Curated annotation (Swiss-Prot):
Gene: Lcp4
One matching Pfam family: Chitin_bind_4
Keyword presence, Transmembrane helix: no
Signal sequence extent: 1-16
GO biological process entries: chitin-based cuticle development
Any single Gene Ontology cellular-component annotation: chitin-based extracellular matrix
Disulfide pairings: none
Protein name in the entry: Larval cuticle protein 4
Molecular function terms from GO: structural constituent of chitin-based larval cuticle
Domain Chitin-binding type R&R, residue spans: 31-92
Function of the protein: Component of the larval cuticle.
Species this chain originates from: Drosophila melanogaster
Length: 112
């Protein structure tokens, strides 16, 4: 039994690939902005573009330990860092009673 466990541990160690190979690397910095891209052989990748105003658009992605492909796109500008992904939490919907109250208040403004 111990030998089977040892063989399984060795197979898992070899398959872990702690040092992935770089498949593509681009770093292009110009006076009017930059382009950066990194792609690894384990499914991880990151890319970004930026302009002279400090605005950056980018994407980073990887494969989770569960085998799920995770992708996050983002924008960074004067409004801050704004990530978007299906895996990020979202706020709950506004309750119907609150929506009705807001509509009533807008339809009946105060007389002051």
């Amino acid at each position: 039994m111990f030998k089977i466990l040892l063989v399984c541990a060795l197979v898992a160690l070899v398959a872990a690939n702690e040092n992935p190979e770089v498949k593509e690397l681009v770093n292009d910095v110009q006076a009017d902005g930059f382009v950066s891209k990194l792609v690894l052989d384990n499914g991880s990748a990151a890319s970004a573009t930026g302009d002279v105003h400090g605005n950056i658009d980018g994407v980073f992605e990887w494969v989770s330990p569960e085998g799920e492909h995770v992708r996050v796109s983002y924008k960074a500008d004067e409004n801050g860092y704004q990530p978007q992904s299906d895996l990020l939490p979202t706020p709950p919907p506004i309750p119907e009673a609150i929506l009705k109250a807001i509509a009533y208040i807008q339809a009946h403004p105060s007389k002051e």
